[in-house]
Amino acid sequence: MRDLKHVFVMTYGRSGSTLLMGILNSIPGWLLRGENRHAMRHLYDFHHSGMAEKARVDPDRASQPTHPWFGIDGYPEVASLQHIRALAEATLLRPAPDTRVSGYKEIRWYDQDLPDYLAFLQQVFPGCRFVLNTRNLADVAASNYWTHKDDPLGQVQRIEERMLSAAEGLGDAVHRVHYDDYVADPEVLRGLFSWLGEVYDQNRIHEVLATPHSRPAKHRAGDLSL
């Protein structure tokens, strides 16, 4: 398995995260993918189920072929995490030969057990870091991604509060940026680049900012309403 660094962008819909992804992907050796509809969450549920049932059963009894949960006592935590990482890198991340930093941005960080999910990602991708992107919530709620939902401003407020609360447990593994700030003055991104250990290239950043990103949102069935 390659010695890659991993960075994940945490945000919500219509926060300007596609632009942020473009900024980060302008760094040589970076390859962050876009959204995957929270696909890693399914792997978290898989792993969490295996670990929970392993802890629940009596290992002496569950190791017997006459037990209804025969074999779950041997659920291999380390192997599971290794295979989950291999699957994610082979399917979702697909790093190029020259990729140094891999990851993705996602807008679906609204689960009640978000701190546990983040801890899982840290197990799967040791040393991974998170960039938490926020935006003026009134502007977010007014976008067509949210206006068809019940209480759009209340929803994005609750999502942001949950992300910020979970981020408190990440310590130095998370860095927050605010869309309105870096669009008004890209120089504020120097702090992010310093935290990442990357060179801030002013010309490259301005080229990205001058390039249109994203597109008008379409209403999608299945997006969670909070």
Task: Label every PLM stretch briefly.
Residues 1, 90-96:
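Short boundary motifs at domain starts and secondary-structure transition points
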Residues 80-92, 165, 169:
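Catalytic alpha-helical scaffold of carbohydrate-active enzymes acting on polysaccharides/glycoconjugates
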Residues 45, 50-58, 95-202:
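PAPS-dependent sulfotransferase catalytic domain
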Residues 1-87, 202-204, 208-226:
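PAPS-dependent sulfotransferase catalytic core
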